[in-house]
């Protein structure tokens, strides 16, 4: 997972721009609700901004139902977010400009391209932040769906999901990947947490994110496919160049040196892939025994 640049739009300006365009309809009194809650929501938006550096969003308390009883206003705040609104389109365009264009990789899994602006604090939980630009994070379909509304442990008041805009990554790989068996003539891996990880908040939050979004099985499936493709390529390369090496082991060790040089670069799944290639004795034995001239 990685850090992104977030929108610079002012939260109160966005809220007022959307709210001032609201009209009262037959079933809802949106304009009246906006006017009634405006000052309270402004205070909440200011408090959100004060809690991103350093990040302490877990200490926020929603206006509803703790401090307010009008749930019709909460629904109005919740429904202010819509991908069709110009203000949201502008935030999305800004995020794309700041983070590499429309083909932004999901900053959580780094596997798929982003498809949604996810509400880090779910609008079902705190609707007053439904259009806060700093609360909108570009995520892929998978991570957006898995995250759902479970962002906070109510028992410990600790956040469960890494905030790609304001959390600082631990700087280390908390996962490892090993080939554990050969199935149908192809290596099969296991992705697990590293042992002996330091007990600090950054590492704990990353582990919690992988767990709650169920990313380890997704990484495993991806690495298994990558290993299958790579093994076919390696076998073909040895057939074409076997005369350049002293032995099959010599060839494989040289390949591993290349993988080793790439273990600290690339996306999470690319690093797990190279980890499996370099640190799996079962794979070493299988490759050397199956290289053919």
Model-derived segments and spans:
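Short flanking/linker segments adjacent to small metal-binding domains or redox-active Cys/His motifs
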Residues: 179-221
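Glycine- and acidic-residue-rich phosphate-binding/metal-coordinating active-site segment common to enzymes
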Residues: 113-197
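Short Cys/His-rich Zn2+-coordinating modules
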Residues: 82-95, 118-125
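N-terminal accessory alpha/beta regions
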Residues: 2-88
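Alpha-helix initiation/capping motif
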Residues: 10, 69-74, 132, 138-140, ...
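Short cysteine-rich loop/turn motifs with clustered Cys
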Residues: 93-116, 140
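C-terminal, charged low-complexity interaction regions
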Residues: 1-28, 203-293
């Amino acid at each position: 997972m990685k850090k992104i640049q977030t929108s610079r739009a002012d939260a109160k300006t966005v809220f007022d721009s959307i709210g001032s365009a609201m009209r009262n309809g037959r079933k809802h009194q949106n304009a009246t609700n906006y006017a009634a809650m405006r000052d309270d929501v402004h205070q909440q938006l200011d408090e959100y901004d004060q809690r991103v550096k350093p990040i302490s969003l877990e200490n926020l308390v929603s206006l509803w139902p703790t401090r307010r009883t009008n749930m019709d206003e909460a629904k109005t705040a919740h429904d202010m977010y819509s991908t069709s609104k110009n203000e949201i389109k502008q935030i999305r365009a800004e995020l794309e400009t700041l983070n590499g264009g429309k083909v932004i990789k999901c900053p959580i899994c780094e596997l798929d391209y982003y498809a949604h602006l996810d509400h880090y604090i779910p609008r079902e939980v705190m609707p007053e932040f439904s259009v806060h630009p700093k609360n909108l994070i570009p995520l892929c379909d998978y991570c957006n769906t898995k995250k759902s509304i479970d962002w906070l442990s109510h028992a410990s008041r600790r956040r469960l999901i890494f905030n790609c805009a304001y959390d600082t990554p631990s700087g280390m790989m908390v996962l490892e990947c090993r080939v554990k068996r050969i199935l149908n003539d192809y290596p099969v891996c296991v992705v697990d947490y590293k042992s002996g990880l330091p007990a600090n908040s950054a590492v704990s939050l990353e582990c919690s994110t992988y767990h709650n979004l169920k990313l380890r099985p997704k990484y495993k499936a991806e690495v298994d496919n990558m290993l299958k493709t790579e093994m076919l390529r390696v076998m073909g390369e040895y057939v074409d160049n076997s005369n350049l090496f002293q032995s099959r082991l010599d060839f494989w060790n040289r390949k591993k040196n290349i993988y080793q040089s790439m273990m600290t670069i690339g996306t999470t799944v690319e690093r797990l892939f190279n980890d499996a290639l370099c640190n799996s004795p079962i794979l070493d034995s299988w490759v050397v025994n199956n290289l053919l001239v």
